[in-house]
Amino acid sequence: MTDPAHHDDRPTLVIKVGGNDLDDATFVAELARVVAAIRPLPVLVHGGGKEIGILQETLGSTPRFVGGLRYTDATALTAAEMVLCGSVSTRLVAALIAAGADALGISGVDRGLIRVVKQEHPAGDLGRVGRPTAVRGEVLRDLLDHGVIPVIAPIALGPDGPYNVNADEAAGAVAAALGVSEAVFVTNVPGVLVKGDVMRYLTRSEIERLIADGTISGGMIPKVRAALTALDAGVHAARITNLEGLLNQGTTIITEREPHE
């Protein structure tokens, strides 16, 4: 286990990992090994990916997406809660403990960690999908101060009960609340690809142009938007990468380029 006395006053790292690889035991074990070794201790935010859709279908509902975000009716919310707060959270916590870390699974509902309002989207109604409005950073700092890695499931508390939250947006909100040095969004690609090449840096204006021309599309859009939101809220850097590049590779989202870049 991590020594609870080990404390570092530097800002920590917030890592968001997507759900589509979290049913791969080898990936989960390697992720846990890398995350457990990071100092200062990081915060991990996870998705649920295809496991949510599979369970949703088992419950008799067909998954659908609006603008890259999961439409969440009552059945979809039940599936998301069961997968995110249940099987995926337990799997990640078990892997981190096996890797020598101390970890605790927590959702955005627990202790009112993440508060949300219903998210509006120009592409249509999203159902019970929330937009983060507040994060109780002190809850996470207390865990970190005691040597515990928080593993956050993005089910959050709205004015009328639980809401599903896009994990990228949840990670951006958590990163902003903690004032972290960097938010890292782990995907199944090595970064934002333009004509097959990983872009080392991208600015807001470049991202908007690449979204407009279709180069950035689908599930990558919420990731780059969350990265920009994290920057707007004061996070020093936001990076999109894969597991192999978690520590220092991928695409770093910046406010603007220096003149020599």
UniProtKB/Swiss-Prot annotation:
Keywords in alphabetical order: Amino-acid biosynthesis, Arginine biosynthesis, ATP-binding, Cytoplasm, Kinase, Nucleotide-binding, Transferase
Role noted for this protein: Catalyzes the ATP-dependent phosphorylation of N-acetyl-L-glutamate.
Positions of substrate binding: G48, G49, R70, N164
Protein's UniProt name: Acetylglutamate kinase
Gene name tied to this protein: argB
Any GO CC annotation of this UniProt entry: cytoplasm
One Pfam family linked to the record: AA_kinase
Reaction(s) this enzyme catalyzes, per UniProt: N-acetyl-L-glutamate + ATP = N-acetyl-L-glutamyl 5-phosphate + ADP
Pathway terms, separated by semicolons: Amino-acid biosynthesis; L-arginine biosynthesis; N(2)-acetyl-L-ornithine from L-glutamate: step 2/4
Domain of life from the UniProt record: Bacteria
Organism in which the protein naturally occurs: Roseiflexus sp. (strain RS-1)
InterPro entries: AceGlu_kinase-like_sf, AcgluKinase_fam, ArgB, Asp/Glu/Uridylate_kinase
Marked site (Transition state stabilizer) residue numbers: K16, K223
